[in-house]
Amino acid sequence: MFELESNSLFERRLERFSRRHPELQRRLSRLFRDLEEDPFQPHLRLHGLSGHLEGVSAVWLTYQYRVTFTIDVGQNLIKLLNIGNHDEVYR
């Protein structure tokens, strides 16, 4: 079981995202639950990023929206970094 950790910047982005996309709340709750259980589940489409985001991973919320984070497998810790559309989170 993994622990999810966020900072104030992620919390603000999550709040803004939730206000703009209330229809995705159930899916977002499931995504966070699934990340806690096992971030390597195939349906999450976990993938590592490269370039200036090397060391960061992402999962799909929908085809358009992503959540980015870092994983510390040794400590079972996921640090949430960003949520938003593809272009926003990969800047």
Show the residue positions of the predicted features.
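Basic, Lys/Arg-enriched alpha-helical interface segments
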Residues: 1-65, 72-79, 88-91
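Residues forming the ATP-binding cleft of Hanks-type serine/threonine protein kinase domains
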Residues: 84
